[in-house]
Amino acid sequence: MSFKSLLKNLPKFFFLGLIHIYRWTISPLLGSPCRFFPTCSQYALQALKHHGCIKGLGFTIKRIGKCGPWHPGGVDLVPMTTLEESLDISPATNDDDSCDSQA
């Protein structure tokens, strides 16, 4: 990865790191199951990886806004930009730290 590319992706890496810290520290203490699949933190990881920082944060904020007793939950996948991406619906895992795909 070039220095220019690293600088461009720095905000995305920052937010990915914050989400991982949340998943390793705060999320286990909450103990309540998420009403959505994938979970909000998995959704945020996928949104940031597929759409970058600005769009990814937008999708994440919209998703977190749905979290509450007024919404039934269910399957809510990250919108994909191409048919090929939309066919890959595998959820992010705790050990998935790759940031290979970008929109």
Curated annotation (Swiss-Prot):
* Gene Ontology CC terms, in alphabetical order: plasma membrane
This protein's name = Putative membrane protein insertion efficiency factor
Q: Which Pfam families match?
A: YidD
Which NCBIfam families does the protein's record reference?
membrane protein insertion efficiency factor YidD
Chief site of localization: membrane
- Per its UniProt record, what InterPro entries does this chain match? Membr_insert_effic_factor_YidD
User: What does this protein do, in the record's words?
Assistant: Could be involved in insertion of integral membrane proteins into the membrane.
Query: What topology does the record note for this protein and the membrane?
Result: Peripheral membrane protein
Keyword Zinc on entry:
no
